[in-house]
Amino acid sequence: MATPVRMKDKYNREVVPRLQEQFNYTNLMQVPKISKIVINRGLGEASQNAKALDGSIAEVARIAGQKPVVTRAKKAIAGFKLRAGVPVGVTVTLRARRMYEFLDRLVSVALPRIRDFRGVSPKAFDGRGNYTLGLREQLIFPEIEYDSVDKIRGMDITICTTAKTDEEGRALLAALGMPFRK
């Protein structure tokens, strides 16, 4: 049997009872939980530079622990010198065990490594309890070696929850250890 994931264990033991008491849920299934985490990286230069795409795929795969999918342009846009079908980014969706492992690494290791870090914005919710976090550099993850990086690139991390409101989503992420700015 596999060892339990630390973040999942914390959710079941501490977070569920706390949220059930805070929001007066009568049923355990009403308590919000994280359904998936999506990591997305747009690559503007990928249409001209295929090497940038390969490097980005390798980096996101190392960070997420799972191979990303290449996203392609749906239609041509002359102003951006873009043709339909040209690679424009990479995305990966994490669920279950990998999702909890990634969230644990993000909260406890990666975010504290950001320079001048004072917490993440509490306003980045979408109105339905989902949270999106933009990172400016990939070097905050310990899986990425400084020497192997050709260019500093950011990424978007979306944490999708089953929460109905932003308040519930914020309470869930705060209970899991997300460091929100005061």
UniProtKB/Swiss-Prot annotation:
Short name of one Pfam family: Ribosomal_L5
Entry annotated with the keyword Endoplasmic reticulum: no
Source organism, top-level taxon: Bacteria
GO biological-process terms attached to the record: translation
NCBIfam families noted in UniProt: PRK00010.1
Function according to Swiss-Prot or TrEMBL: This is one of the proteins that bind and probably mediate the attachment of the 5S RNA into the large ribosomal subunit, where it forms part of the central protuberance. In the 70S ribosome it contacts protein S13 of the 30S subunit (bridge B1b), connecting the 2 subunits; this bridge is implicated in subunit movement. Contacts the P site tRNA; the 5S rRNA and some of its associated proteins might help stabilize positioning of ribosome-bound tRNAs.
Family: Belongs to the universal ribosomal protein uL5 family.
The name this protein goes by in its record: Large ribosomal subunit protein uL5
